Each structure stands twice: as structure tokens, then as C-alpha cells.
Amino acid sequence: MPTHDANIQTRIEKDSMGEMPVPADVLYGASTQRAVLNFPVSGRGMPDAFIRAYATLKRACAEVNQKLGRLDAERTGAIAAACDQIEAGLSDHGGLARHFPVDVFQTGSGTSTNMNANEVIANLVCLARGEPIGSSKNAAYLQAGGVHPNDHVNMGQSSNDTFPTAMHVSAALAIAHDLVPAFDRLHAELDKKAQAWDRIVKIGRTHLQDATPIRLGQEFSGYAAQIAQAKGRLARALDVLSELALGGTAVGTGINTHKDFGRLVAEALTDRTGVRFREADNHFEAQHAKDAFVEASGTLRAVAVALSKIANDIRWLGSGPRCGIGELKLPAVQPGSSIMPGKVNPVICESVIMVACQVLGNDHAVTLGAFGGVGSVLDLNVAMPMMAANLLESVRLLANASDMFRENLLENLEPDEERCAALIEGSLAMCTSLVPAIGYDKSAALAYVAYREGKTVRELALEQKLLPEAELVRLLDPRSMTEPDAE
């Protein structure tokens, strides 16, 4: 266990296990300090988005407890004001990370983070009342209207229902406020390219081999549709995340809370955030399992797969510049090699693909965290901090990668129309359009001879006089091959 730094000034706080030296200027107390000493694992605290969501939740809980007649107006207002400071990032106190230091790899229920929030809120109230940090358990202070971390901030709650609730709230807010808008912007750019480039005909490719022609706009309309469908999947993820565990307290029975508490807090969160939340239909399922969270993470996996497909296709189509496909001209954003002068690499595409890989890894960790016998054991899941941190990282990475992809690549992406036309004319797949006129076998033989003699399908068909020239011109028009027959 880490030892105390003798140079750090401390104050003495107490919890149910006794006295604990705590750094003098931090807002947390004894329970949090024990967790700091117990879990020196990764050096990563819970994400800021999660801490802010916890503060939003604690505020809603206080307001509902007042509405139910369990908490007086003065304490409710004090707790709400403290939560506002946390939501704003505690900039006057050195930032969230300083006061929410508990490692991601902590107790699997997230109890340490819940107590961290309770203690910070209570100590912010102490400061607001002109009392020193650490006064929140002083009897005289409490009799005078002070706020206790457990009795008031945590009233009607348990770590076992607040932490899973904060998981859903933080994930839903991040998806709704960060990822969906980023995908709106990405979809708009892809759709813009699809419309602008619909006149450009190029060769299609299946199995990385030449296929029949396709319009560049058609390809990009497919990419735009992928993102539109991803947005639909995200909407469904928001729906499963909207169900909250709050109100179940320790094991789902609701001991020590009001029967309407969970419902009213969900309504308060909806009003405050603009994202819809509702009380869980079954609190035992909501606390004992994490199926909804796995489903939401799986949605992010599907979204990542879509992004990887688009980025990889553009990387292939931009390969070259002289010896690759070269149908797209990728913007040069940085030198690509320390040994090959003038080389420019598809670094933005590579970054997006790496993000997708990381999201898939995060999803696997989330899935394991919900797996029976690993995280989900009897009446509580005990891998929640890790699950929450991984899913929130996935949302952040996907949102940032989407904007980066759009700003640093798509907006300045250009087609090489001459290259597209040249590759179509040289493709053996052009013979496909002759099948209705001369049959499959003759078309296949034509393609074979054209390949062997280094000629285009058009040149050889004219030489062999297989069809009248006007008919050949009509059948070998590349654009006509990009639509179904009219009849």
C-alpha cells in the first residue's frame, strides 16, 4: 500500500473504519482517501463525463427528496449549488481530476466513486457556509443546517443503484450531445459528396477485382446511408439506456427509499438534460445484470465497423498516386515518410481505423464485465466502473474521429475524373453489358482475348464486328450500366 508523503499537509477525517489523514486542500474525505490508497492501479480516474453525470443525478435526488418532504429546502439548495459547481468542472478548485481521484479499477460496485461524490458535495457545502473542509460530520454544524455526505447527499440511495444509473445517464448524454451531432455533420458531408459526384462514372470492384461500372456518387450515397443507419442504431441505444436503476437501493427491493423516488428522479433528469429517462420496469434486472449496457456498447461496435469500412474504402480508392487505384485525391496533411521524400500517407483513414479497433476492444471488455460469473454475480454487477469508462471512451473516440475524418479529409477530398474514365475504358468488366446481346459465353471469350492481347473490350468488339457500331456505343456507355433496365 502506498505511504503518505510527509511533505503534504493533511487534515484528519473519520469514517466508519476510523481516522484517516486526507490532503488538507482536497474536497473529498476519508472514504475516498482509503480508495486512493487501496487502488493505485492505472492512474486513471472516472471520466469527467461520468463525474458530471453523477452530479446531475445527485442534484435530481436532492430535489426529489425535498418534493417528497424528506429534505428541507435549505439543504436541497446547498446540494444543488454544489452539484452545479461539479457540473461546471470545479475550475475554482483545480478541476475535477484533483477531487475525483479514485481509480477506474476500484470496487466493482463503484461505491468509492459514489462516496467520492457524496464527500465532495458535502465539503463544497461546508465552504459555501463559511466552514472548513471536513466539517460535514460535526454535530453542531449539522444541527445548524449543514449537509452530511450520507444522511443528506446520499438520502434514499445506494451505490448499487446510483452508480448504474450514472452509467446510463452519462452514456446517454454523451451519445445524444456528442456522438449524434458529430454523425449529423458526417452524414451531411457524405451526402454532399454523393450529390456532387453523381455524374462521375468509375469502375466498381468486388473481391478487389474489376466489376461493372458504378457512379462515384452512388458509392458515397452508400457511405451516407451507413451513417444514417448508424444514427438510427444510436437512437435505439438511447432508448435502452433511458431505463434507470435508481429506486432499487441495495439489491433492487427499494429499502430505505420512497416508492416514487426512482420515477420522480427519472422525470427530473429528463427535464434537466433534455434526454428522456424512465424508471426501470424491474429493479432486480436493472441492478443484477447489465444487458442494456452491453447492447449500447454493441451499437458503438457496429458504428465503429461502419466508420472503418468507409475509411478503408477511401484509403484504397486514394492509393497511389501513380501506381495505385488513384480515383480519389486525398488531401496531404503531413509528410508520410522519414526516408522516402514526397511520400504522403492516408493518415486520417488510418487513425479512424485504429479508433474502430479500440472501440471493438472496449466493447469486448464491456461484454466481459457483464458476463455471468465475471461481473454479473447474483444480486449485483461488480465490474461497473470499468464498463462505464470503456463505453464513455468509445463514445468520445467515435465523436472525435468522426469530426476529424470530416474536417481533415472529406471536406477537401477530390475525385480524379480522368483516372476514373481511363480505368473504366480499360476494364474487362465492360463486356458484362454485352451479355444480353451476344450471350455469356461470347462475352467471356471476348474478355479473355482482350486481356491476352492487351486491348480494350471496345477495341476488340469493333474489330470482330460482333455488333453494329452504334449498338456497341450504346451498350458500352458506362453510365447506362449504373442503372437497372427501364423495362
How would you label these PLM feature ranges?
Residues M1-E487:
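Conserved, well-structured ligand/cofactor-binding cores
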